[in-house]
């Protein structure tokens, strides 16, 4: 019983771990560091190339529910994230380097996993395989997958935010607070007056951007939209978006700022901070010039500039089943952002389901289709039931889950949906596993 997993990102690492935990021998292929991508910086597994946040912890948030469901299956990614988390108020954020290093250690030390660092350019259709090559799939493998699925790849762009050193932030201006007072005050906040914001806004929308290739249409995912593109929607868009000041009163003045830029810890030591919501494709000198206009960041030292990259994904509703298996070729599974799920936790979830099912298929057991009342099942259902004519990446959200049978007050509806999901998942586990 041998399973091939192609791609050592979040989905591939989770898929390999889940299958290995079922007693299956796994060959996990990762091309880095032999061959790298435009977005990756290291050769470690499960490298986080965008934010260091796995989003909300609360069960009143769908991402919080999905994380809790993953923990029920001893998810490798969740286990490591919980071990290396950094303070981030109501969110689960991690030390970026420690996270990928620890995932790599778990994989390398697992007796049932062989980690092979080389590029895969062919897919053996007779060999049970999980394809988790990510949104930056290499050209040669993209062509092979297109032949397998019989469809062209779709694509969108997303971007990463810059990171600055803690010591270069002016703490006489920036202050600690968490929005609405939720959790501990783990965010550094840079306040802006109306005049400061308007000056910053003009510089931002007029700054030079890295051009796209002339033949490529600019399609961006809302959750990773460049800050300058968001600003172009209107002068107040940022003030009602990532720069909203609500709940962040400035203790130095006792007043509510006109706008606030939040910075979140990027490593456990607290020496690095990322600019929350500042994904960008501005040219690097422009990032330094424009972002130093933010009060408190006048002397900011940038250790990583924001970058933008092209993400590709298959038209899953045309080709996949709800257990992430290729309809026309049983035994071949897809997982991660290449399927059209969007986000770290969502990629992990698809890897978990694909890895479990690949192992079960190898062992001659029935594959699992998760109940759609669960976050795991709702996400998988979206992937196969969305319109193939306009298929777009999707984060987990309560809108994907069925309505409650009984009407409840709006303020407790999400909590009740989470309670139902976890109860149904427990019953599903007892019945099927």
From Swiss-Prot:
Pfam families documented for this protein: GIDA
Where is this protein localized, as stated in its record? Cytoplasm
Q: Which InterPro entries match?
A: FAD/NAD-bd_sf, MnmG-rel, MnmG_N, TrmFO
| Gene Ontology BP annotations | tRNA methylation; tRNA wobble uridine modification
GO CC, sorted alphabetically, is: cytosol
Entry cofactors = FAD
Query: Taking the first listed entry, what is the main subcellular location of this protein, grouped into a coarse class?
Result: cytoplasm
In terms of domain of life, where is this protein from?
Bacteria
Specify which residues bind FAD according to the UniProt entry for this protein: 7-12
Q: Name one GO molecular function term.
A: tRNA (uracil(54)-C5)-methyltransferase activity, 5,10-methylenetetrahydrofolate-dependent
- As recorded in UniProt, its EC number(s) are 2.1.1.74
Keywords attached to this Swiss-Prot or TrEMBL record, sorted alphabetically, are:
Cytoplasm, FAD, Flavoprotein, Methyltransferase, NAD, NADP, Transferase, tRNA processing
Reaction(s) catalysed by this chain's protein: uridine(54) in tRNA + (6R)-5,10-methylene-5,6,7,8-tetrahydrofolate + NADH + H(+) = 5-methyluridine(54) in tRNA + (6S)-5,6,7,8-tetrahydrofolate + NAD(+); uridine(54) in tRNA + (6R)-5,10-methylene-5,6,7,8-tetrahydrofolate + NADPH + H(+) = 5-methyluridine(54) in tRNA + (6S)-5,6,7,8-tetrahydrofolate + NADP(+)
HAMAP family xref list: TrmFO
Similarity comment text for this entry: Belongs to the MnmG family. TrmFO subfamily.
Record's function text: Catalyzes the folate-dependent formation of 5-methyl-uridine at position 54 (M-5-U54) in all tRNAs.
Q: Which PANTHER family match?
A: GLUCOSE INHIBITED DIVISION PROTEIN A, METHYLENETETRAHYDROFOLATE--TRNA-(URACIL-5-)-METHYLTRANSFERASE TRMFO
Any idea what this protein is called? Methylenetetrahydrofolate--tRNA-(uracil-5-)-methyltransferase TrmFO
Q: List the lineage, top down.
A: Bacteria, Bacillati, Bacillota, Clostridia, Natranaerobiales
């Amino acid at each position: 019983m041998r399973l091939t997993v192609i791609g050592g990102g979040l989905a591939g690492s989770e898929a390999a771990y889940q299958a290995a935990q079922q007693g299956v021998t796994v060959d996990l292929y990762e091309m880095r560091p032999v061959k790298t991508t435009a977005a990756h910086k290291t050769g470690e597994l499960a490298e986080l190339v965008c934010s260091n946040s796995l989003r909300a912890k609360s069960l009143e948030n769908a991402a919080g529910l999905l994380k809790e469901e993953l923990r029920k299956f001893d998810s490798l990614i969740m286990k490591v994230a919980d071990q290396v988390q950094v303070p981030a108020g109501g969110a689960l954020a991690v030390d970026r380097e420690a996270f990928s290093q620890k995932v790599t250690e778990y994989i390398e030390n697992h007796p049932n996993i062989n980690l092979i660092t080389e590029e895969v350019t062919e897919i053996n259709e007779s060999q049970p395989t999980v394809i988790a090559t990510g949104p930056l799939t290499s050209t040669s493998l993209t062509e092979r997958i297109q032949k397998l699925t019989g469809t062209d790849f779709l694509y969108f762009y997303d971007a990463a935010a810059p990171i600055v050193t803690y010591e270069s932030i002016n703490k006489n201006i920036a202050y600690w607070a968490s929005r609405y007072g939720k959790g501990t005050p783990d965010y550094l906040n840079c306040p802006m007056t109306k005049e400061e914001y308007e000056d910053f806004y003009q510089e931002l929308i007029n700054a030079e951007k890295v051009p796209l290739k002339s033949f490529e249409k600019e399609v961006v995912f809302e959750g990773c939209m460049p800050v300058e593109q968001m600003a172009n929607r209107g002068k107040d868009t940022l003030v009602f978006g990532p720069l909203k000041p609500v709940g962040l009163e400035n203790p130095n003045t006792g007043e509510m700022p006109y706008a606030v830029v939040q910075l979140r810890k990027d490593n456990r030591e607290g020496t690095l901070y990322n600019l929350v919501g500042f994904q960008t494709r501005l040219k690097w000198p422009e990032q330094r010039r424009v972002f130093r206009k933010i009060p408190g960041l006048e002397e900011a030292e940038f250790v990583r500039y924001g970058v933008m990259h092209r993400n590709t994904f298959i038209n899953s509703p045309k080709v996949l089943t709800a257990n992430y298996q290729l309809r026309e070729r049983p035994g071949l599974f897809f997982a991660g952002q290449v399927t059209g799920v969007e986000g770290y936790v969502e990629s992990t979830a698809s890897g978990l389901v694909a890895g479990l099912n690949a192992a079960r298929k190898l062992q001659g057991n029935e594959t699992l289709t998760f109940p759609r009342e669960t976050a795991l099942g709702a996400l998988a259902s979206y992937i196969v039931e969305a319109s193939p004519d306009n298929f777009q990446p999707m984060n987990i959200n309560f809108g994907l889950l069925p309505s409650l049978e009984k009407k409840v007050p709006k303020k407790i509806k999400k909590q009740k949906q989470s309670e139902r999901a976890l109860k149904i998942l427990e019953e599903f586990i007892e019945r099927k596993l």
